[in-house]
């Protein structure tokens, strides 16, 4: 009888300790326009702060949607659909589908449990490339304002998004945001240079719209935010207009500013 009561108690204590450790983790998202340099910035941080953990945007998932109804055979592979391509080619038809899937994939990333090695560190920092919040306040909001999401779709999106945020609570909460800032013109220049096939049809005007959304949300604080913990979240604005990938001094400056920002959270 004694062993039966001890084991659940030990499990409960272990769970609570794990939960307490996880609550001490500082979670931040890196936000910014398309092609502002988020992936390059994350590589810079990961090379410097190797004890931190980094979660990149699940781009490949959006580019490869596998049919679940396909009957596999030894001589063929399941068909794949590039949802990102579909959305850019026909935004009015595919925006709601894409935003639903992209947001779901972001939720999956943000609620993933931390590994034991991470939990054993003295300082626990987790960095996400974008977040469930920018999915709503930047991209879905922009698509609605461009009339690619209709009134019904926008209402439904906000309804289930709010429900999931409240349901997952602390597991998707952020402690800070790193906002990578560059002009839309510079982002468009970088977009053309990287030549991602899905982005061939993107115009400067779209990047200008996304830039304005970031400014309203993170700088001017005029975006109406539904979640109390996000209304006064600390934001570190980093100007990345100039190249920092091939400039070690610029890279060091960014690293130092991020280190100081994280230490102050």
From Swiss-Prot:
GO terms for molecular function: ATP binding; deoxyguanosine kinase activity. It is an enzyme of class 2 (transferase). ATP binds at residues 32-40, 190-194, 242-244. One of its GO terms (cellular component) is mitochondrion. It is found in: Mitochondrion. Its EC number is 2.7.1.113. GO terms for biological process: deoxyribonucleoside monophosphate biosynthetic process. Homodimer. Belongs to the DCK/DGK family. This is Deoxyguanosine kinase, mitochondrial. It comes from Xenopus laevis (African clawed frog). The gene is dguok.
């Amino acid at each position: 009888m004694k062993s039966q009561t001890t084991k659940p108690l030990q499990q409960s204590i272990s769970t609570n300790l794990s939960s307490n450790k996880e609550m001490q983790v500082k979670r931040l998202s890196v936000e910014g326009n398309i092609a502002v340099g988020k992936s390059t910035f994350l590589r810079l941080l990961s090379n410097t702060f190797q004890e931190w953990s980094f979660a990149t945007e699940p781009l490949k998932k959006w580019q490869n949607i596998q049919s679940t109804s396909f009957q596999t055979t030894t001589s063929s592979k399941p068909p794949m659909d590039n949802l990102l391509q579909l959305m850019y080619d026909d935004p009015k038809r595919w925006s709601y589908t894409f935003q639903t899937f992209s947001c779901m994939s972001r939720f999956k990333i943000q609620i993933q449990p931390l590994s034991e090695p991470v939990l054993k560190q003295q300082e626990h920092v987790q960095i996400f490339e974008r977040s469930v919040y920018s999915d709503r306040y930047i991209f879905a909001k922009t698509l609605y304002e461009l009339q690619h999401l209709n009134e019904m779709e926008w209402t439904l999106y906000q309804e289930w998004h709010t429900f999931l945020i409240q349901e997952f609570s602390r597991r998707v909460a952020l402690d800070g945001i790193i906002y990578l800032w560059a002009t839309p013109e510079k982002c468009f220049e970088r977009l053309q240079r990287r030549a991602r096939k899905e982005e061939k049809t993107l115009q400067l005007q779209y990047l200008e719209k996304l830039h304005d959304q970031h400014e309203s949300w993170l700088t001017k604080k005029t975006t109406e935010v539904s979640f109390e913990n996000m209304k006064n979240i600390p934001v570190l604005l980093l100007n990345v207009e100039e190249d920092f990938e091939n400039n070690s001094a610029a890279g060091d400056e960014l690293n130092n500013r991020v280190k100081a920002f994280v230490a102050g959270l």
